[in-house]
Amino acid sequence: MMTSCRNIDLGTMMMACGCGRRQFPSLAKTVCKFTSSNRSYGGLVGSCKAVPTKSKEISLLNGIGQSQTVSFDLKQESKQPISLVTLFELVAVDLQTLNDNLLSIVGAENPVLISAAEQIFGAGGKRMRPGLVFLVSHATAELAGLKELTTEHRRLAEIIEMIHTASLIHDDVLDESDMRRGKETVHELFGTRVAVLAGDFMFAQASWYLANLENLEVIKLISQVIKDFASGEIKQASSLFDCDTKLDEYLLKSFYKTASLVAASTKGAAIFSRVEPDVTEQMYEFGKNLGLSFQIVDDILDFTQSTEQLGKPAGSDLAKGNLTAPVIFALEREPRLREIIESEFCEAGSLEEAIEAVTKGGGIKRAQELAREKADDAIKNLQCLPRSGFRSALEDMVLYNLERID
């Protein structure tokens, strides 16, 4: 894989294309090339060539003129593990305001609905989706010359978290989950009927606030996400224990269930910054690739982490017949795995045998490569943004996800 970038303004700070060096404070143009054998951003090896501002780009392309070259291996750099606390430091105030507003925004008059909302919001959560909205909002606002975030940026983050929360309530009902983030789920506390109504109410309330943004492009974008949620659930339900499920079908289902909301979040943030359409599209692709990478990593962890780490039994997706990337890859090399799955684990110990076959058949390794491939694509999508702390935080979000399987 080769990524090339030309004619990048350096100023006095950092270079683009993932090169955060300060070696060239008086130079203004670079050609950066990165190569990778394993397609992982963390494994990129590259070099940057910088020339004085007065040199013309054509001389760079032809290798003419005075220049100096610095080679570096990003894989060799020592870097502390990325935590969510440090990841969202730049938008901590924005996220605190969002947390303070969430319950009042739900605004339910029915005490049961209020209790349900308090249960799900009070359970905490990483607030990753609104965090992404704020990071992209700040990064693109800089590009558009905005001094601060708009009311629309902030309302979008709140709407996204409400939609995500509503989807979790419904997911817990469908999956019959009794715990969420260490707390009892809404349907476990209040019953299935109240949980379904609470999720419906939150979707409706989010839609009302969405309509009040009065931006048709964003309204269509977010409305499509709600449709995608349903499409993803139907796709999953109709393909349980189906060993002929293709990787493309898995990725489409993962887009519907996970990446669609992330992509809409990042694109919506860019739209409200009023940047050029090509930038908003790159932000959509960034969200899509990041969302897919996250889902693939989650599906890997279902096999590699313990029940205590997962908060649910290991291999629980497989046990329900939900075939994810590691299983799809392993099925190509392990005929016995097909037999076990199609029997729906009717024999004692068959689930444990299937989990072992997934690892033995190279399913975990190939799924890791796929997650890194999507991560690489996400990093490339960010190259349209000016180098800033906010862009660096978005890059770190990609790396944070990959660190979960390193």
Swiss-Prot record:
Signal peptide: none
Compartments (UniProt record): Plastid, Chloroplast
Positions with a binding annotation for Mg(2+) 2: 171, 175
Positions of isopentenyl diphosphate binding: 126, 129, 164, 181
Cofactor binding: number and manner: Binds 2 Mg(2+) ions per subunit.
InterPro entries: Isoprenoid_synthase_dom_sf (IPR008949), Polyprenyl_synt (IPR000092), Polyprenyl_synt_CS (IPR033749)
UniProt tissue specificity: Higher expression in leaves than in roots.
Catalytic activity: 5 isopentenyl diphosphate + (2E,6E,10E)-geranylgeranyl diphosphate = all-trans-nonaprenyl diphosphate + 5 diphosphate; isopentenyl diphosphate + (2E,6E)-farnesyl diphosphate = (2E,6E,10E)-geranylgeranyl diphosphate + diphosphate
Ligand binding (Mg(2+) 1): 171, 175
Activity across pH: Optimum pH is 8.0.
One GO location term (cellular component): plastid
A Gene Ontology biological process term: isoprenoid biosynthetic process
Superkingdom of this protein's organism: Eukaryota
Disrupted-gene phenotype: Decreased levels of plastoquinone-9 (PQ-9) and plastochromanol-8 (PC-8) in leaves. The double mutants sps1 and sps2 exhibit an albino phenotype and are devoided of both PQ-9 and PC-8 in cotyledons.
PANTHER family referenced in this protein's UniProt entry, alphabetically: ALL TRANS-POLYPRENYL-DIPHOSPHATE SYNTHASE PDSS1, GERANYLGERANYL PYROPHOSPHATE SYNTHASE
General remark: Plants over-expressing SPS1 exhibit increased resistance to photooxidative stress, decreases in leaf bleaching, lipid peroxidation and PSII photoinhibition under excess light due to their increased capacities for plastoquinone-9 (PQ-9) biosynthesis. Plants over-expressing SPS1 exhibit decreased singlet oxygen production in response to photooxidative stress due to increased levels of PQ-9, which acts as a chemical quencher of singlet oxygen.
Known function: Involved in providing solanesyl diphosphate for plastoquinone-9 (PQ-9) formation in plastids. Catalyzes the elongation of the prenyl side chain of PQ-9 in plastids. Contributes to the biosynthesis of plastochromanol-8 (PC-8) in plastids. Does not contribute to the synthesis of tocopherol or ubiquinone. PQ-9 and PC-8 are lipophilic antioxidants that act as protectant against photooxidative stress under high light stress conditions. Prefers geranylgeranyl diphosphate to farnesyl diphosphate as substrate. No activity with geranyl diphosphate or dimethylallyl diphosphate as substrate.
Protein name: Solanesyl diphosphate synthase 1, chloroplastic
Lineage: Eukaryota, Viridiplantae, Streptophyta, Embryophyta, Tracheophyta
